[in-house]
């Protein structure tokens, strides 16, 4: 099944809800970055959370999330847009612990760390950016997105993200949900939301069992009839890197740096952090870039 995200209203229009299956997308990220279990779970959770923030944006806006904890995984970076296109990378892809956490799951908190920052940069278009930053509160990532939304954007939310990793490090299931309270929500509605959240199985297990974004939202809302579906968006791993972009980056290094590439290395190879694609520049190509540099 192809990955997709569903936006809806629930609780008499008092909550905006999102759910997504991202299994194929996270499989692609795992394949590109050769991530081991804990790194896969952390990267997949971050990418899914970033996907939800991207889905909140306007058509031409982009969002970049960086989670920088004190654990062995190092910084995790993901970016997404309103069209469901997402990419991401983790600094140390080879983190695996033989011991599970107290809940019997992969110990993502230990991998990410419990001290550090979650940063969000919104590219609003026209060269205008908005940056928000909150401390990591758990290292489990879903709770950290929840805290960011409440603190930096003043939106009371609940974010649940999960990745089920097979013993051979392949991805079995991935996805998540996000619920946001809208102004006017009553105490009764909040109580009902809390009750439904408590009864919700873990995201990755729901997706492994074949649940769709629509059926996850129905559980979240307390019934399919209580949902007003707004939009369905395809989700995929997409990277917009290109040789031209890397050429521009090389030009920005300046003539001295390019001269050293020509004289010492007789060429250059650039690798995209996000997708691991590589771009080779011959000595002749570097000479052309040298002429364009200042």
Swiss-Prot record:
GO CC terms in record: cytoplasm
Matching Pfam families: HSP33 (PF01430)
Record's comment on post-translational modification: Under oxidizing conditions two disulfide bonds are formed involving the reactive cysteines. Under reducing conditions zinc is bound to the reactive cysteines and the protein is inactive.
Chief location of this protein within or outside the cell: cytoplasm
Places the protein is found: Cytoplasm
Gene Ontology BP terms: protein refolding
Family: Belongs to the HSP33 family.
Summary of the function given for this chain in its UniProt record: Redox regulated molecular chaperone. Protects both thermally unfolding and oxidatively damaged proteins from irreversible aggregation. Plays an important role in the bacterial defense system toward oxidative stress.
Protein name: 33 kDa chaperonin
Source organism of the structure: Listeria monocytogenes serovar 1/2a (strain ATCC BAA-679 / EGD-e)
Gene: hslO
């Amino acid at each position: 099944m192809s990955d997709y995200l569903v936006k809806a209203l629930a609780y008499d229009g008092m909550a905006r809800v999102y759910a997504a299956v991202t299994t194929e997308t996270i499989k692609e990220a795992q394949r590109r970055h050769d991530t081991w279990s804990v790194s896969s779970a952390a990267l997949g959770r971050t990418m899914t959370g970033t996907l939800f923030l991207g889905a909140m944006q306007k058509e031409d806006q982009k969002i970049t999330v960086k989670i920088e904890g004190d654990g062995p995984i190092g910084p995790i970076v993901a970016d997404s847009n309103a069209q469901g296109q997402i990419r991401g990378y983790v600094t140390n892809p080879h983190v695996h612990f033989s011991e599970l956490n107290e809940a019997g799951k992969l110990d993502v908190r230990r991998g990410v760390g419990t001290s550090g920052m979650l940063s969000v940069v919104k590219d609003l278009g026209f060269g205008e950016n908005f940056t928000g930053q909150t401390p990591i509160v758990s290292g489990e990532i879903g709770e950290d997105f929840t805290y960011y939304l409440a603190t930096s954007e003043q939106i009371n939310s609940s974010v649940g993200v999960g990745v089920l990793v097979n013993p051979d490090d392949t991805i079995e299931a991935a996805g998540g949900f996000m619920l946001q309270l809208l102004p006017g929500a009553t105490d009764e509605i909040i109580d009902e939301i809390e009750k439904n959240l408590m009864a919700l199985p873990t995201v990755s297990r729901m997706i492994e069992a074949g649940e769709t974004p629509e059926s996850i939202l129905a559980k979240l809302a307390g019934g399919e009839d209580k949902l007003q579906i707004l939009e369905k968006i395809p989700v995929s791993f997409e990277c917009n890197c290109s040789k031209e972009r890397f050429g521009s980056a090389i030009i920005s290094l300046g003539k001295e740096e390019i001269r050293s590439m020509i004289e010492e290395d007789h060429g250059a190879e650039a690798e995209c952090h996000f997708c691991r694609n590589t771009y080779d520049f011959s000595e002749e190509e570097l000479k052309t870039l040298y002429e364009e540099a200042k």
